[in-house]
């Protein structure tokens, strides 16, 4: 069965939802591998190490622009299938880029509010340069064997519970 046959037999809404969800999953996989590559590439690693030494981030908007720009290479070819498929795929990629940029910044500025994961916080805090590459989730770290759990000490857990809001982060 080729893609055009599948496209012609499924209802339009199902195709849009499928492409959107597939793009979210694909975006998370790309995020994982790009971050892992940053830790294993000498040239890119030098630039990325500045991020680790300063333990600060560019802000949600700048991170999003960087992620969206890098993801664009994976967006435009899908438009050859159809406009509908291309749009749903691109929106999925951009939604994940926004979620990832927000999660990344939140784990730097206010990790207690990142209730779905603290993997990136742990990656930085405990210098796990060969572990925990996910920014917004740990799924691919678990799949590829790079997940390394770390139990926060009770005092550290208390310190993380600071009274900051979900939007109390660097945006620019």
Predicted region positions:
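Short, amphipathic, aromatic/basic-enriched membrane-interface segments that mark the entry/exit
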Residues: 53-65
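Membrane-proximal soluble regions of multi-pass membrane proteins
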Residues: 107-172
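Short, strongly hydrophobic alpha-helical membrane anchors
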Residues: 1-14
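Transmembrane alpha-helical segments that form the membrane-embedded catalytic/substrate-channel core
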Residues: 24-39, 93-112
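Core segments of transmembrane alpha-helices
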Residues: 62-81, 134, 138
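Cytosolic, membrane-interface loops and tails of multi-pass inner-membrane proteins
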Residues: 38-56, 114-123
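Alpha-helical transmembrane segments
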Residues: 11, 15-26, 88-93
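Hydrophobic alpha-helical transmembrane segments and immediately flanking/interface helices
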Residues: 78-106, 153-172
């Amino acid at each position: 069965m080729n893609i055009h046959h599948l496209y012609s037999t499924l209802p339009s809404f199902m195709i849009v939802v499928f492409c959107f969800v597939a793009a979210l999953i694909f975006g998370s996989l790309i995020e994982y591998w790009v971050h892992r590559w940053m830790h294993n590439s000498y040239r890119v690693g030098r630039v990325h190490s500045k991020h680790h030494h300063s333990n600060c981030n560019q802000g949600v908007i700048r991170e999003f622009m960087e992620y969206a720009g890098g993801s664009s290479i994976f967006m435009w070819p899908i438009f050859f299938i159809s406009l509908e498929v291309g749009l749903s795929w691109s929106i999925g990629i951009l939604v994940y880029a926004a979620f990832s940029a927000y999660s990344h910044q939140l784990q730097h500025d206010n990790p207690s509010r990142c209730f779905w994961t603290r993997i990136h916080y742990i990656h930085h805090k405990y210098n796990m340069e060969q572990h925990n590459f996910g920014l917004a989730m740990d799924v691919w770290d678990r799949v590829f064997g790079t997940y390394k759990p770390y139990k926060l000490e009770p005092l550290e857990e208390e310190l993380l519970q600071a009274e900051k809001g979900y939007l109390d982060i660097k945006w620019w």
